[in-house]
Amino acid sequence: MINKDIYQALQQLIPNEKIKVDEPLKRYTYTKTGGNADFYITPTKNEEVQAVVKYAYQNEIPVTYLGNGSNIIIREGGIRGIVISLLSLDHIEVSDDAIIAGSGAAIIDVSRVARDYALTGLEFACGIPGSIGGAVYMNAGAYGGEVKDCIDYALCVNEQGSLIKLTTKELELDYRNSIIQKEHLVVLEAAFTLAPGKMTEIQAKMDDLTERRESKQPLEYPSCGSVFQRPPGHFAGKLIQDSNLQGHRIGGVEVSTKHAGFMVNVDNGTATDYENLIHYVQKTVKEKFGIELNREVRIIGEHPKES
């Protein structure tokens, strides 16, 4: 039963067309899984995010943020409270050697804008399917580059709805980690300081990275991207491969035969299938090599109710 008081309060804070009730979240995840959100809102202004977060905090309503859903699994039980989609905060601005991008902008698009302005430093991001907000949240990286290498600052909102501007140092960016996660902040926009370069050289590097990605990753199936973090001194994919787990399937989800670090939805898989397969892989690798695999992918939402 949807809380009418919450709905009416949201209508005072954000235009009605930006509010959806009992919205299926599988529409917004790369895995094509997930239950419904009680309330799903799509703000287009920073002030709208602040207003909703402040209201939710004052009324003890849980808030969940969603970018483009590329490195997340949402359980079939859905998400209670308010889900805030940041995808409409997608502005990209160039000023001299800097780029300022909204949380919802695709980091791929930001890397392409940098190329178009002959700015180097974001080539590594040309194949990362996440949004700017998600990329800062987890210090996304690929092929030797990371967000922390070029970010200047991030404008965030805290749990009380207040704006906070954090410098590179204050963001505490580490391997797939940041102060954003620890303090339950949300990124509204981020600025990147780049360097002048040659467009042809930038394009050549992006072409090379794109070819490497397409040849090695199972892009033909829905997936949540890289499932596990890299254990110190090892590669998660190699450990999974050496455990003879490629092709292992639970329900409709299997460990990719193309890249063992990925799990793909090959036959109407569910979030429960993903979660069970993740646990099985972790258990098997631990038993075989004594190494813990920590998840890179986020798993959120409630478990489905048993019928």
UniProtKB/Swiss-Prot annotation:
The keyword NADP applies. Its EC number is 1.3.1.98. The active site is at 176, 226 (proton donor), 296. Its main location: cytoplasm. Keywords: Cell cycle, Cell division, Cell shape, Cell wall biogenesis/degradation, Cytoplasm, FAD, Flavoprotein, NADP, Oxidoreductase, Peptidoglycan synthesis. It is an enzyme of class 1 (oxidoreductase). One of its GO terms (biological process) is peptidoglycan biosynthetic process. The keyword Transmembrane does not apply. GO terms for molecular function: FAD binding; UDP-N-acetylmuramate dehydrogenase activity. It holds the Pfam family FAD_binding_4. One of its GO terms (cellular component) is cytosol. Residues 33-197 form the FAD-binding PCMH-type domain. Its cofactor is FAD. Cell wall formation. Belongs to the MurB family. This is UDP-N-acetylenolpyruvoylglucosamine reductase. The lineage of its organism: Bacteria, Bacillati, Bacillota, Bacilli, Bacillales. The gene is murB.
